[in-house]
Swiss-Prot record:
One MF annotation (Gene Ontology) recorded for this entry: ion channel inhibitor activity
Signal peptide per UniProt: 1-22
Cellular location(s): Secreted
Main location: secreted
InterPro entries, A to Z: Conotoxin (IPR004214)
The name this protein goes by in its record: Conotoxin 3
Disulfide cross-links: 47-61, 54-64, 60-71
One Gene Ontology CC term in the entry: extracellular region
UniProt note: domains: The presence of a 'disulfide through disulfide knot' structurally defines this protein as a knottin.
Residues cleaved off as propeptide: 23-46
Keywords recorded for this protein, A-Z: Disulfide bond, Knottin, Secreted, Signal, Toxin
Upper classification of the organism: Eukaryota, Metazoa, Spiralia, Lophotrochozoa, Mollusca
Family: Belongs to the conotoxin O1 superfamily.
Tissue: Expressed by the venom duct.
Length: 72
């Protein structure tokens, strides 16, 4: 009977500690794991089609015409 009471009190104490720390740390995680769609978008090369402007930040699918600064 005493052992059962000790186990119940220990479980309640651990549960309370987890709930308290979960409330305190909400939104403060520094190094969050990237979601799979974020990882995929970072790995996907996006290119601009024909006639779109190109430059340092925009990559063309084929080539960039430096005179017109458009994709060819």
């Amino acid at each position: 009977m005493k052992l059962t009471c000790v186990v119940i009190v220990a479980v309640l104490l651990l549960t309370a500690c987890q709930l308290i720390t979960a409330d305190d740390s909400r939104g403060t995680q520094e190094h969050r794991a990237l979601r799979s769609d974020t990882k995929l978008s970072m790995l996907t090369l996006r290119c601009e089609s024909y006639g779109k402007p190109c430059g340092i930040y925009n990559d063309c699918c084929n080539a960039c015409d430096p005179a017109k600064k458009t994709c060819t």
